[in-house]
Amino acid sequence: MSAGNGTPWGSAAGEESWAASGVAVEGSELPTFSAAAKVRVGVTIVLFVSSAGGNLAVLWSVTRPQPSQLRPSPVRTLFAHLAAADLLVTFVVMPLDATWNITVQWLAEDIACRTLMFLKLMAMYSAAFLPVVIGLDRQAAVLNPLGSRSGVRKLLGAAWGLSFLLALPQLFLFHTVHRAGPVPFTQCVTKGSFKARWQETTYNLFTFRCLFLLPLTAMAICYSHIVLSVSSPQTRKGSHAPAGEFALCRSFDNCPRVRLWALRLALLILLTFILCWTPYYLLGLWYWFSPTMLTEVPPSLSHILFLFGLLNAPLDPLLYGAFTLGCQRGHQELSIDSSNEGSGRMLQQEIHALRQQEVQKTVTSRSAGETKDISITSI
């Protein structure tokens, strides 16, 4: 029996992190470290290295002081928090998954079981809530570009606070279960925490809504408002502004080209969220309503679907890198446009001055001629 046959997600790591994670121990046949699990561990290590390097680079990039800015840009602050959430996934979820697949059973103490399951779910919540905060901020930046952005810190605090509170039940639901017999076996599961199966299903569905449905719905509403606002006739009419309008920007983040790149980045984050987590949660829903699916789905497929979820953390730094390059290109074009506009204004001023000099010379010469004629007539 492979290490993945005992869990709804096909792994001893307990991908069903909000409920019955881990390998069930009721059966007579214990799980093993299968070939599919070995491949999964190898891929997880690759994702860990890429995610850790990328998100640490993003965190360093967005937190270092910018000499051209008096205060940090809201966009940089948001992606600093998103990088922190991805690092929490990287350093909690990925090592836990790889180690648990290798050891097959739980080798740590009960307190470690409860704490790690709490941190794992908190990491998943934060990685789901912070893209929502980014979507709300982009909506405010597009609909009210000159408005106050003081609410960003409150939204970030709410996202982290909810992640902490919603993950607290893990501390009480998870515990270690020991199996006596010829081969002792210990696992970190929720066995015995729910008196009836419907209670466990209700908890799973509640967490599914908070982790996937609510963030997806909130982001869809935000970007729908943005698309409707951008596509409205008034917005299109006002979009053809002269280059001098950039001088009215109160910060680099409020400039139209930066808002456009930030909006594109936020949309890409939404798409990666959907592509990475939809297969993961669909498999979970299937298991909750049809537990016999464990015998119908190959373990290799379950491994692949879970790795799709882990892929989200390494992708975010790549998207931020593309955003940074786009902003730098837009900033260079903005500088060129501003310099060209300044040169054009100087040329117009010089031409106007020359014309004024020519007019003044003409008037002076005419005045001198009239004075000479008057003198001759008098003689």
Swiss-Prot record:
GO cellular component terms listed in the entry, alphabetical order: plasma membrane
Glycosylation sites: 101
Superkingdom field: Eukaryota
Protein's job: Receptor for gonadotropin releasing hormone II (GnRH II). This receptor mediates its action by association with G proteins that activate a phosphatidylinositol-calcium second messenger system.
UniProt record, GO biological process: cellular response to hormone stimulus; G protein-coupled receptor signaling pathway
Protein name (database record): Gonadotropin-releasing hormone II receptor
GO-annotated molecular function: gonadotropin-releasing hormone receptor activity
Membrane topology, record value: Multi-pass membrane protein
Extracellular side: 1-40, 97-114, 179-204, 298-303
Pfam family, one: 7tm_1
InterPro entries registered for this protein in UniProt: GPCR_Rhodpsn (IPR000276), GPCR_Rhodpsn_7TM (IPR017452), GphnRH_fam_rcpt (IPR001658)
Family: Belongs to the G-protein coupled receptor 1 family.
Localisation per UniProt entry: Cell membrane
Keyword annotations from UniProtKB, A to Z: Cell membrane, Disulfide bond, G-protein coupled receptor, Glycoprotein, Membrane, Phosphoprotein, Receptor, Transducer, Transmembrane, Transmembrane helix
Location, primary (coarse class): membrane
